[in-house]
Curated annotation (Swiss-Prot):
Protein name, UniProt field: Autophagy-related protein 18
Keyword Cytoplasm: no
Any one GO biological process: nucleophagy
Gene Ontology CC: one annotated term: endosome membrane
Keyword annotations from UniProtKB, A to Z: Autophagy, Endosome, Membrane, Protein transport, Repeat, Transport, Vacuole, WD repeat
Amino acid sequence: MNFVTFNQDHSHLGVGTSNGYRVYTTDPFNKQSESREGDVSSLEMLFSTSLVALTLSPRVLRIQNTKGKRHSTICEMTFRTAILAMRLNRKRLVVVLESELYIYDISNMQMLRTEKTSPNPNAICALSASSENNYLIYPLPTKAAPATFQPPSHAPPKSDHIAPTSGEILIYDATKMEAVNVIEAHNSPLSCIALNNDGTLLATASEKGTIIRVFSIPDAQKLYQFRRGSIPARIFSMSFNSTSTLLSVSSATETVHIFRLGAPNTSRSNSISSGPTTLLSTSHQRSSSRTSEDISDEFGSSTADMAASERKPLNPTFASMIRRTSQTVGKSFAATVGGYLPSAVAEIWEPSRDFAWVKVPRSPNAASAGPVRTVVALSNNGPQIMVVTSEGNYYVFNVDLEKGGEGTLYKQYS
């Protein structure tokens, strides 16, 4: 299995293999279409239509109509470098290369724009499923410093951009074809981003993977901050449910976290570390955002480390006392105390843990093969979470939305 993905409304699941691809419905789980031709490294579906975009070789993209037994090719394009990802909605096709984005009008496959990016080997990019809020999100390009010497004529051309050193995000209007805002989401480079169905919320995670943040789009206000854990782990996948009340997050830890999105305290979020409301932010906003993440991450890590090393329950450390207190403190008390603390420190007191989670089973032979990659989606038909693993397993877990806690395995397919 080369690749796996859900479509925009999580009703279909696409799998790319070295011998073609398969498309399944998720509820009930049935194979809808397949092709046994080509080495498919990635694919994207357009909702529940018969249109599928395929990457058949590192540089070749094919748009196919899967209706009927004979799949017809609508168009085929070859790019200068390897295709790392594709994004689709009813208006746009975005092709992600390592240092470029190609944006097409999906109605006639006319290329509208090419955007230069910083090196983006992990294809960090999200396109809204909504045609009205048609936003494209990717890491803010960072210009390289001017060369101090003239390279020899035979040397290959150097990129105008360098790899990002922080988690700044560009919000791009894919209808008007213009940048509209910038979010300073994290101090570390990004590892994963996800948009909700309406194109109004953006979830972000950095390479540390300890803090998940949710911003409003396009005004870039920080609405929620969640803590996945204290130990850094790479975030593989994030997904909102259809009503944007839940956010699921999978990582290299084999635990899938589910966070509840209640009514955000926007006035406080805005005053603490909201993103800039214009394309250029002030130096004060930059400093505040980065300082808050540093303190929040360091607080969580030091607390976990001290609690783990302290083995004398009759003489608890100050850190372990704070840890227990923070788990039981009420929301009203946290909000009151937060009002008197500096903005960077106030975020520590916010109750931001997951309310539910599931444990992804591992096969016995996978223990020495490193972390199992997972892709997650929340079902539109009930309180369930769907998880697909790089081992080729598809799991459906039931989640208790009232009590939370650990979800139970409901179905499993291989």
